[in-house]
Amino acid sequence: MARTFFVGGNFKLNGTKSSIKEIVERLNNAKLDPKVEVVLCPPAPYLDYTVSLVKKSQVSVGAQNAYLKASGAFTGENSVDQIKDVGAKWVILGHSERRQYFREDDQLIAEKTAFALSQGVGVILCIGETLDQKKAGTTLQVVERQLQAVIDKVKDWSNVVIAYEPVWAIGTGLAATPEDAQEIHHSIREFLAKKLGEKTAQETRILYGGSANGKNAVTFKDKPDVDGFLVGGASLKPEFVDIINSRS
Protein backbone atom coordinates (compact mmCIF):
# COMPACT_ATOMS: atom_id res chain seq x y z
CA MET A 1 0.00 0.00 0.00
CA ALA A 2 1.09 3.59 -0.59
CA ARG A 3 1.94 5.41 2.62
CA THR A 4 1.99 9.22 2.47
CA PHE A 5 5.58 10.45 2.62
CA PHE A 6 6.17 12.37 5.86
CA VAL A 7 8.88 14.89 6.70
CA GLY A 8 9.14 16.32 10.21
CA GLY A 9 11.36 19.24 11.12
CA ASN A 10 12.57 19.18 14.73
CA PHE A 11 14.01 22.63 15.47
CA LYS A 12 15.14 21.45 18.95
CA LEU A 13 16.27 24.36 21.16
CA ASN A 14 16.89 26.63 18.18
CA GLY A 15 15.16 29.54 16.56
CA THR A 16 13.91 33.07 17.05
CA LYS A 17 10.80 34.76 15.70
CA SER A 18 12.77 36.12 12.77
CA SER A 19 14.52 32.83 11.88
CA ILE A 20 11.28 30.84 12.19
CA LYS A 21 9.49 33.36 9.98
CA GLU A 22 12.24 32.90 7.39
CA ILE A 23 11.92 29.08 7.52
CA VAL A 24 8.13 29.09 7.18
CA GLU A 25 8.07 31.72 4.45
CA ARG A 26 10.62 29.67 2.51
CA LEU A 27 8.20 26.72 2.63
CA ASN A 28 5.21 28.95 1.80
CA ASN A 29 6.99 30.18 -1.33
CA ALA A 30 8.64 26.91 -2.40
CA LYS A 31 7.22 24.43 -4.86
CA LEU A 32 6.73 21.45 -2.55
CA ASP A 33 5.83 17.94 -3.67
CA PRO A 34 2.06 17.98 -2.93
CA LYS A 35 2.12 14.30 -1.94
CA VAL A 36 4.30 14.96 1.13
CA GLU A 37 3.00 15.68 4.64
CA VAL A 38 5.23 18.19 6.46
CA VAL A 39 5.25 18.88 10.21
CA LEU A 40 7.27 21.71 11.78
CA CYS A 41 8.20 21.35 15.46
CA PRO A 42 9.54 24.64 16.85
CA PRO A 43 10.28 25.33 20.52
CA ALA A 44 7.08 25.68 22.58
CA PRO A 45 7.12 29.50 22.85
CA TYR A 46 6.87 29.72 19.05
CA LEU A 47 4.11 27.15 18.39
CA ASP A 48 1.35 29.76 18.14
CA TYR A 49 3.49 32.02 15.95
CA THR A 50 4.49 29.19 13.62
CA VAL A 51 0.86 28.11 13.18
CA SER A 52 -0.04 31.71 12.25
CA LEU A 53 2.61 31.79 9.50
CA VAL A 54 1.88 28.49 7.73
CA LYS A 55 0.00 28.94 4.44
CA LYS A 56 0.18 25.48 2.86
CA SER A 57 -2.43 22.86 3.78
CA GLN A 58 0.16 20.06 3.60
CA VAL A 59 2.21 21.74 6.36
CA SER A 60 1.16 21.48 10.00
CA VAL A 61 2.81 22.21 13.34
CA GLY A 62 3.84 19.93 16.20
CA ALA A 63 5.31 20.25 19.68
CA GLN A 64 8.61 18.72 20.79
CA ASN A 65 7.16 17.37 24.04
CA ALA A 66 3.97 17.21 26.12
CA TYR A 67 3.10 16.10 29.62
CA LEU A 68 0.86 13.16 30.55
CA LYS A 69 -1.63 15.17 32.60
CA ALA A 70 -4.28 17.56 31.34
CA SER A 71 -3.52 20.28 33.89
CA GLY A 72 -2.27 20.87 37.41
CA ALA A 73 0.79 21.69 39.48
CA PHE A 74 3.45 20.65 36.96
CA THR A 75 5.70 23.68 36.65
CA GLY A 76 7.45 24.02 33.31
CA GLU A 77 5.35 21.46 31.44
CA ASN A 78 2.94 21.91 28.52
CA SER A 79 -0.30 19.96 28.20
CA VAL A 80 -1.69 18.39 25.04
CA ASP A 81 -4.77 20.62 25.30
CA GLN A 82 -2.56 23.71 25.36
CA ILE A 83 -0.66 22.49 22.31
CA LYS A 84 -3.94 21.85 20.49
CA ASP A 85 -5.33 25.20 21.64
CA VAL A 86 -2.66 27.07 19.67
CA GLY A 87 -3.23 24.93 16.58
CA ALA A 88 -0.55 22.25 16.80
CA LYS A 89 -1.57 18.77 15.65
CA TRP A 90 1.44 16.60 16.48
CA VAL A 91 3.90 15.95 19.29
CA ILE A 92 7.33 14.31 19.25
CA LEU A 93 7.73 11.77 22.06
CA GLY A 94 10.60 9.46 23.01
CA HIS A 95 13.33 11.50 21.34
CA SER A 96 16.79 10.26 22.33
CA GLU A 97 17.62 13.65 23.84
CA ARG A 98 14.59 13.35 26.14
CA ARG A 99 15.66 9.84 27.06
CA GLN A 100 19.28 10.86 27.65
CA TYR A 101 19.14 14.32 29.24
CA PHE A 102 15.76 14.17 30.97
CA ARG A 103 15.89 10.51 31.99
CA GLU A 104 12.64 9.59 30.25
CA ASP A 105 12.35 5.81 30.22
CA ASP A 106 10.31 3.45 28.02
CA GLN A 107 7.46 3.35 30.53
CA LEU A 108 7.07 7.13 30.80
CA ILE A 109 7.25 7.53 27.03
CA ALA A 110 4.56 4.87 26.61
CA GLU A 111 2.31 6.66 29.12
CA LYS A 112 2.87 10.02 27.43
CA THR A 113 2.14 8.48 24.03
CA ALA A 114 -1.10 6.86 25.18
CA PHE A 115 -2.26 10.09 26.83
CA ALA A 116 -1.40 12.30 23.84
CA LEU A 117 -3.27 9.99 21.46
CA SER A 118 -6.29 9.92 23.79
CA GLN A 119 -6.35 13.73 23.65
CA GLY A 120 -6.45 13.81 19.86
CA VAL A 121 -2.98 14.68 18.60
CA GLY A 122 -0.72 12.62 16.38
CA VAL A 123 2.49 11.24 17.88
CA ILE A 124 5.91 11.05 16.25
CA LEU A 125 7.34 8.22 18.36
CA CYS A 126 11.13 8.08 18.38
CA ILE A 127 13.09 4.88 18.91
CA GLY A 128 16.73 4.00 18.33
CA GLU A 129 19.98 2.59 19.65
CA THR A 130 23.19 4.15 20.99
CA LEU A 131 26.63 3.51 19.51
CA ASP A 132 27.44 1.02 22.29
CA GLN A 133 24.22 -0.88 21.61
CA LYS A 134 24.94 -0.89 17.88
CA LYS A 135 28.47 -2.23 18.49
CA ALA A 136 27.04 -4.91 20.78
CA GLY A 137 24.68 -6.01 18.01
CA THR A 138 21.55 -5.31 20.07
CA THR A 139 19.88 -2.74 17.78
CA LEU A 140 16.75 -4.82 17.17
CA GLN A 141 16.38 -5.84 20.82
CA VAL A 142 16.56 -2.18 21.83
CA VAL A 143 14.01 -0.86 19.33
CA GLU A 144 11.67 -3.80 19.98
CA ARG A 145 11.84 -3.14 23.73
CA GLN A 146 11.06 0.54 23.16
CA LEU A 147 8.14 -0.33 20.89
CA GLN A 148 6.78 -3.05 23.16
CA ALA A 149 6.36 -0.56 26.02
CA VAL A 150 4.07 1.52 23.80
CA ILE A 151 2.29 -1.50 22.29
CA ASP A 152 1.33 -2.54 25.84
CA LYS A 153 -0.55 0.76 26.25
CA VAL A 154 -1.67 1.70 22.73
CA LYS A 155 -3.85 -0.48 20.51
CA ASP A 156 -4.84 2.06 17.84
CA TRP A 157 -1.73 3.15 15.93
CA SER A 158 -3.52 5.11 13.18
CA ASN A 159 -2.18 8.42 14.55
CA VAL A 160 1.35 7.21 15.31
CA VAL A 161 4.34 7.81 13.06
CA ILE A 162 7.52 5.98 14.13
CA ALA A 163 10.89 7.71 13.75
CA TYR A 164 13.88 5.38 13.85
CA GLU A 165 16.79 7.51 15.01
CA PRO A 166 20.13 5.77 15.41
CA VAL A 167 21.41 7.84 18.33
CA TRP A 168 25.01 7.54 17.12
CA ALA A 169 24.02 9.38 13.93
CA ILE A 170 22.19 12.35 15.47
CA GLY A 171 24.03 15.62 15.03
CA THR A 172 27.26 13.78 14.28
CA GLY A 173 27.15 13.99 10.50
CA LEU A 174 27.26 10.18 10.47
CA ALA A 175 24.30 8.50 8.84
CA ALA A 176 23.19 4.92 8.47
CA THR A 177 23.43 3.78 4.86
CA PRO A 178 20.09 3.60 3.05
CA GLU A 179 20.54 -0.18 3.01
CA ASP A 180 21.07 -0.29 6.79
CA ALA A 181 18.04 1.92 7.37
CA GLN A 182 15.86 -0.20 5.07
CA GLU A 183 16.90 -3.39 6.86
CA ILE A 184 16.03 -1.99 10.30
CA HIS A 185 12.80 -0.34 9.11
CA HIS A 186 11.75 -3.66 7.57
CA SER A 187 12.48 -5.45 10.85
CA ILE A 188 10.44 -2.83 12.74
CA ARG A 189 7.53 -3.39 10.34
CA GLU A 190 7.77 -7.16 10.82
CA PHE A 191 7.70 -6.64 14.61
CA LEU A 192 4.60 -4.45 14.29
CA ALA A 193 2.93 -7.10 12.14
CA LYS A 194 3.65 -9.76 14.73
CA LYS A 195 2.34 -7.64 17.62
CA LEU A 196 -0.42 -5.53 16.04
CA GLY A 197 -1.33 -7.27 12.80
CA GLU A 198 -0.34 -6.91 9.16
CA LYS A 199 -2.79 -4.06 8.45
CA THR A 200 -1.34 -1.80 11.17
CA ALA A 201 2.20 -2.70 10.13
CA GLN A 202 1.54 -1.78 6.51
CA GLU A 203 -0.24 1.47 7.37
CA THR A 204 2.25 2.80 9.95
CA ARG A 205 4.83 5.19 8.57
CA ILE A 206 8.43 4.68 9.68
CA LEU A 207 10.74 7.67 9.30
CA TYR A 208 14.53 7.77 9.28
CA GLY A 209 15.98 10.25 11.76
CA GLY A 210 19.76 10.20 11.72
CA SER A 211 21.48 13.23 10.15
CA ALA A 212 19.23 13.38 7.09
CA ASN A 213 20.17 16.30 4.84
CA GLY A 214 19.56 17.74 1.40
CA LYS A 215 22.28 15.61 -0.17
CA ASN A 216 21.67 12.17 1.35
CA ALA A 217 17.84 12.21 1.48
CA VAL A 218 17.54 11.27 -2.19
CA THR A 219 19.66 8.13 -1.63
CA PHE A 220 16.77 6.65 0.40
CA LYS A 221 14.37 7.13 -2.52
CA ASP A 222 13.96 3.49 -3.52
CA LYS A 223 13.80 2.05 0.00
CA PRO A 224 10.24 0.73 0.42
CA ASP A 225 10.15 0.81 4.23
CA VAL A 226 11.56 4.34 4.61
CA ASP A 227 8.45 6.54 4.64
CA GLY A 228 10.10 9.88 5.28
CA PHE A 229 12.46 11.70 7.62
CA LEU A 230 12.58 13.34 11.01
CA VAL A 231 15.07 16.11 10.34
CA GLY A 232 17.07 18.02 12.95
CA GLY A 233 19.63 20.66 12.00
CA ALA A 234 18.84 20.59 8.29
CA SER A 235 15.23 21.65 8.98
CA LEU A 236 16.58 25.10 9.90
CA LYS A 237 18.27 25.50 6.50
CA PRO A 238 17.19 25.97 2.87
CA GLU A 239 18.04 22.31 2.16
CA PHE A 240 14.91 21.31 4.12
CA VAL A 241 12.99 21.93 0.88
CA ASP A 242 15.27 19.45 -0.92
CA ILE A 243 14.52 16.82 1.73
CA ILE A 244 10.77 17.38 1.36
CA ASN A 245 11.11 17.02 -2.42
CA SER A 246 13.54 14.08 -2.31
CA ARG A 247 10.92 11.64 -3.66
CA SER A 248 9.81 13.76 -6.60
Curated annotation (Swiss-Prot):
GO terms for cellular component: cytosol. InterPro entries: Aldolase_TIM, TIM_sf, TrioseP_Isoase_bac/euk, Triosephosphate_isomerase, Triosephosphate_isomerase_AS. Keywords: Gluconeogenesis, Glycolysis, Isomerase. Pfam families: TIM. GO terms for biological process: gluconeogenesis; glyceraldehyde-3-phosphate biosynthetic process; glycerol catabolic process; glycolytic process. Substrate binds at residues 10, 12. The active site is at residues 95, 165. It catalyses: D-glyceraldehyde 3-phosphate = dihydroxyacetone phosphate. One of its GO terms (molecular function) is triose-phosphate isomerase activity. The keyword Isomerase applies. It comes from the Eukaryota. Pathway: Carbohydrate biosynthesis; gluconeogenesis; Carbohydrate degradation; glycolysis; D-glyceraldehyde 3-phosphate from glycerone phosphate: step 1/1. It is an enzyme of class 5 (isomerase). Its EC number is 5.3.1.1. Homodimer. Belongs to the triosephosphate isomerase family. This is Triosephosphate isomerase. It comes from Zygosaccharomyces bailii. The lineage of its organism: Eukaryota, Fungi, Dikarya, Ascomycota, Saccharomycotina. The gene is TPI1.
